[in-house]
Amino acid sequence: MNNARPIRRALISVSDKTGIVEFAQALAERGVDILSTGGTARLLAEQGIAVTEVSDYTGFPEMMDGRVKTLHPKVHGGVLGRRGQDDDVMEKHGINPIDMVVVNLYPFAETVAKEGCTLADAVENIDIGGPTMVRSAAKNHKDVTIVVNAHDYNRVIAEMDANDKSLTLETRFDLAIAAFEHTASYDGMIANYFGTMVPSYGENKEGDEESKFPRTFNQQFEKKQDMRYGENSHQAAAFYVEANPQEASVSTARQIQGKALSYNNIADTDAALECVKEFNEPACVIVKHANPCGVALGKDILEAYNRAYQTDPTSAFGGIIAFNQELDAETATAIVERQFIEVIIAPSVSAEAIEVVAAKKNVRLLECGEWTTKTTGFDVKRVNGGLLVQDRDQGMVSLGDLKVVSKRQPTEEELKDALFCWKVAKYVKSNAIVYAKGDMTIGVGAGQMSRVYSAKIAGIKAADEGLEVAGSVMASDAFFPFRDGIDAAAEAGIKCVIQPGGSMRDDEVIAAADEHGMAMIFTGMRHFRH
């Protein structure tokens, strides 16, 4: 698949000028004639690089404030012309072959992300000539090289040096794929932006002129990893990441050691990391099958880990551990000496901790970096034939948001524990019940079809591990439809309940709490998780 083509003439027109002077200089030193436009041509000329303005080559000036620069047959004919087939036509019309196109596009995404961006600003940053040249060159990759990414500049020069100033068909094809990916992403961003400017469908409020959800939903992801298999061994799988993933995520984490992350590893690590981000104090979250099985705070992460592990040592076996502070050697030692673990993730990992974990070479050790903001954007769930798209669940309550609805007022400690286990319940699969005391989970009931059984399971798990439920707080991710969940909690020893409220039978549920001498707190916010 060699079919090398020499590079004799290149057209360069870039918005992002990172590395372009050095690249153009390298091309010129290798005898490549350079065509260019506007600001790119001026920059190259200022740096002493011989350059021909496209307008001089075509005999047609740039016009309309730069809107029309490269849209000319002498440009596109030179790019699209098939070598050996269109040569006579090109010669007849004075069209020179263009062997390489170096283009990146107007910064549309950066423009619309700016505060105060107007529709007029956005429109002026829609590139027309650029995508046209990119697609033309990519279509004719049999003869023409297209370069859209600055990180490919060195690769191109290296191959030219190794291949008598030529590039192979394999390289041209690979660069063409990158070009089509680039224009697809660009057009998708534009469609998304304009698509939010139409009224919402369905539940549209009166006067709502725009929707945050575009008419068509375009997102592009890049394959980061092929996997041995998916959720089950008979399923093929791969891991894709966003073009610009957010800080401190499983997608951006650096793997320090261990086997390749599996499909389930990635899903569970994401659940653990997003949960531990909720806490400012030293915290540890242990996750198994996407559910927290132990969460705790401590004076340091070692204490937090010891307490989180104490919740459910059985389920912690083969789990995922996440911290919100640097992993130190003492904590790493406690983990590897105590239990089998799949993944450990922390914002940073000390050199000493790396050395400790290295003794268990299969343990996947990840460093995700610090986070400064909450995760934003959309949650997407695939259904057969469609997507469910929603805001991420960023909702959380503070002390001032709580409404005590029982006769008994919660104590200061109960309020503190209520806020702690409410944060945990947000990350437990519905129906979710969490028992907690002293900034430590005591029992977790997850994923049951009836809320009362989740409450019973939380109590059973606490009893199995010898943990004292009496005096604990219970959090429920949604309201109690009946009083039976409160009765089950009281039987286990729960003294305070935090829940959204909003049931048709709230009065019965509150009455049950009063009968048992419980404090009951309403948050007014639900945290279903499916």
From Swiss-Prot:
GO terms for molecular function: IMP cyclohydrolase activity; phosphoribosylaminoimidazolecarboxamide formyltransferase activity. Its EC number is 2.1.2.3, 3.5.4.10. The keyword Nucleotide-binding does not apply. GO terms for biological process: 'de novo' IMP biosynthetic process. Pathway: Purine metabolism; IMP biosynthesis via de novo pathway; 5-formamido-1-(5-phospho-D-ribosyl)imidazole-4-carboxamide from 5-amino-1-(5-phospho-D-ribosyl)imidazole-4-carboxamide (10-formyl THF route): step 1/1; Purine metabolism; IMP biosynthesis via de novo pathway; IMP from 5-formamido-1-(5-phospho-D-ribosyl)imidazole-4-carboxamide: step 1/1. PROSITE patterns: MGS (PS51855). Transmembrane segments: none annotated. Belongs to the PurH family. This is Bifunctional purine biosynthesis protein PurH.
